[in-house]
């Protein structure tokens, strides 16, 4: 999965997919009442990027739905996965459950069209703080109560705080999550970060008894760091330059080992070599 980083304006969806992304990451900011409000990152952000692009969250969802609904004039068949980077740092810990409920209602109405031929992309809810694990239960309970538990088949989870792998496993235990887990690791492209924890996550994924199904690394903008990430065995790389990742994947060393994921590839299934 080539994951376009910080795709917060509707116009950027096409821009990143046309550069080779089959997945996008979108920031979600919340208001004081834990309503998802804007797709907005803010300052500071990755070097070389504008940090200030935004939409109202519900408008973005509608644009995303158009891009991921077969038959729509805006349909992009390659776009199969969306990571919502949930900026819950602005919330009190006791608002996490409420944020999950409200997120579920927004997605149900504006993205999944109340279960009636909505967008088809898989969704990853990425949470920066392990203490905010109740967001997951708020989300899953609400979709079930609204009569659409089947949509949970489309949803996965990620804790993005680079916490110790064991601590992340405990948070999932508390949240009642037993699958659909992506594990992120990384840092802004302005700084360097080694692959120690990525390798640990990959080992957990491949052990057959870990909690991780997929591993992605961010933010990867250079050919050398792309090669390092692929060599470490990641499933996804998040990037500001999808075309760079595409170029590396076409190199002799990688083109027979890796291919771009399609809608037919289950993002919750651990890949067996």
UniProtKB/Swiss-Prot annotation:
Coiled coil: none annotated. Mg(2+) binds at residues 25, 27, 85. It comes from the Eukaryota. It catalyses: an N-(acyl)-sphingosylphosphocholine = an N-(acyl)-sphingosyl-1,3-cyclic phosphate + choline; an N-(acyl)-sphingosylphosphoethanolamine = an N-(acyl)-sphingosyl-1,3-cyclic phosphate + ethanolamine; a 1-acyl-sn-glycero-3-phosphocholine = a 1-acyl-sn-glycero-2,3-cyclic phosphate + choline; a 1-acyl-sn-glycero-3-phosphoethanolamine = a 1-acyl-sn-glycero-2,3-cyclic phosphate + ethanolamine. It is found in: Secreted. Expressed by the venom gland. Its EC number is 4.6.1.-. The active site is at residues 5, 41. Keywords: Cytolysis, Dermonecrotic toxin, Disulfide bond, Hemolysis, Lipid degradation, Lipid metabolism, Lyase, Magnesium, Metal-binding, Secreted, Toxin. The keyword Disulfide bond applies. GO terms for molecular function: lyase activity; metal ion binding; phosphoric diester hydrolase activity; toxin activity. Its cofactor is Mg(2+). Binds 1 Mg(2+) ion per subunit. One of its GO terms (biological process) is lipid catabolic process. GO terms for cellular component: extracellular region. Pfam families: GDPD_2. InterPro entries: PLC-like_Pdiesterase_TIM-brl. Disulfide bonds join 45-51, 47-190. Belongs to the arthropod phospholipase D family. Class II subfamily. Dermonecrotic toxins cleave the phosphodiester linkage between the phosphate and headgroup of certain phospholipids (sphingolipid and lysolipid substrates), forming an alcohol (often choline) and a cyclic phosphate. This toxin acts on sphingomyelin (SM). It may also act on ceramide phosphoethanolamine (CPE), lysophosphatidylcholine (LPC) and lysophosphatidylethanolamine (LPE), but not on lysophosphatidylserine (LPS), and lysophosphatidylglycerol (LPG). It acts by transphosphatidylation, releasing exclusively cyclic phosphate products as second products. This is Dermonecrotic toxin LspaSicTox-alphaIA2iv. The lineage of its organism: Eukaryota, Metazoa, Ecdysozoa, Arthropoda, Chelicerata.
């Amino acid at each position: 999965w080539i994951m376009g980083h910080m795709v917060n304006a509707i116009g950027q969806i096409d821009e990143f997919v046309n550069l080779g992304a089959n997945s996008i990451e979108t920031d979600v900011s919340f208001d004081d009442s834990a309503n998802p409000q804007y797709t907005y990152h803010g300052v500071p952000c990755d070097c070389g990027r504008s940090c200030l692009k935004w939409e109202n969250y519900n408008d973005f969802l509608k644009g995303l739905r158009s891009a991921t609904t077969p038959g729509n004039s805006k349909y992009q068949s390659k776009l199969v996965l969306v990571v919502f980077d949930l900026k819950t740092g602005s919330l009190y810990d006791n608002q996490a459950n409420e944020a999950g409920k409200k997120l579920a209602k927004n997605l149900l109405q504006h993205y999944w069209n109340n279960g009636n031929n909505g967008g088809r992309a898989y969704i990853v809810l990425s949470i920066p703080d392990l203490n905010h694990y109740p967001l997951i239960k708020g989300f899953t309970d609400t979709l079930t109560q609204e009569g659409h538990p089947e949509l949970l088949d489309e949803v996965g989870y990620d804790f993005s705080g680079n916490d110790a792998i064991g601590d992340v496993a405990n948070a999932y235990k508390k949240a009642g999550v037993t699958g659909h887990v992506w594990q992120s690791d990384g840092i802004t492209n302005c700084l360097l970060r080694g692959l120690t924890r990525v390798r640990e996550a990959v080992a957990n994924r491949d052990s057959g008894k870990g909690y991780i199904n997929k591993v992605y690394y961010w933010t990867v903008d250079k050919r050398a760091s792309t090669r390092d990430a692929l060599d470490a065995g990641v499933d996804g790389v998040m990037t500001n330059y999808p075309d760079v990742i595409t170029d590396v994947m076409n190199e002799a060393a990688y083109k027979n080992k890796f291919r771009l994921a399609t809608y037919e590839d289950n993002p919750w299934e651990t890949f067996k070599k």
